[in-house]
A protein has these predicted regions:
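Short acidic low-complexity segments
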Residues: 5-18
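Single conserved hydrophobic/aromatic residue that forms the stacking wall/gate
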Residues: 170-180
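NAD(P)-binding Rossmann-fold cofactor-contacting core
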Residues: 1-2
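Phosphate-binding loop of NTP-binding sites
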Residues: 15-17, 26-167
Length: 180
């Protein structure tokens, strides 16, 4: 895109620039980073790498897998099964290549996306045709602060699903059920 600008900042640089979108790396905790105040004022503009991918390639079949435990194992297993059956399948997200680094994606490519709560927390419009939520238990509360926030992050993988999309809930515990 022609109008894309990069800004490199240090502690002494004051941000007074207006952005349409802010793509936040999943590893950045907005409560503890140098740009905390700016990011908190611009929460509605923060999106994820998953959103950027979906914005440019909505036709690509994605299968998102999230949960507190078992994401990597389940993602790798599903990837290997699909690959063995001859599909052009990629392992992305929190495992494999970052989704925006995948090259050679064609219309028939399937993406298995291991989606962490950090990736999903600021996702606005990523859509996954198939979403699998394995389990949700107390974890990452140092980042999400409350169980409600953590569960809300995990559920973002289904927020934009359509009527014919599929959600699979596996081993959902009692504390999670009120949020579903």
């Amino acid at each position: 895109t022609k109008n894309l600008k990069n800004f490199f900042l240090n502690k002494s640089k004051i941000i007074d620039v207006k952005f349409d979108k802010i793509i936040l790396s999943p590893g950045i905790n907005i409560n503890k980073c140098l740009l905390s105040n700016y990011l908190k004022k611009n929460l509605q503009k923060i999106i994820s790498d998953l959103d950027i991918f979906y914005e440019f390639r909505p036709e690509i079949l994605t299968i998102s897998i999230t949960g507190t435990n078992g994401k990597s194992t389940t993602s790798k297993l599903l990837h290997d099964i699909l690959k063995r059956h001859g599909y052009d399948v990629r392992l992305t997200g929190n495992i494999g290549n970052p989704i925006l680094e995948e090259k050679g994606i064609k219309k028939n490519t399937i993406l298995v996306v291991e989606a962490s709560s950090y990736q999903l927390a600021y996702s606005k419009y990523f859509r996954s045709k198939y979403s699998i939520i394995l389990n949700i238990s107390n974890d990452h509360l140092e980042r999400h602060l409350t169980m409600k926030n953590y569960i809300s992050s995990k559920l973002r993988c289904v927020t934009n699903q359509k009527k014919n999309d599929i959600l699979s809930l596996i081993h959902i515990s009692e504390p999670t059920r009120p949020y579903l």
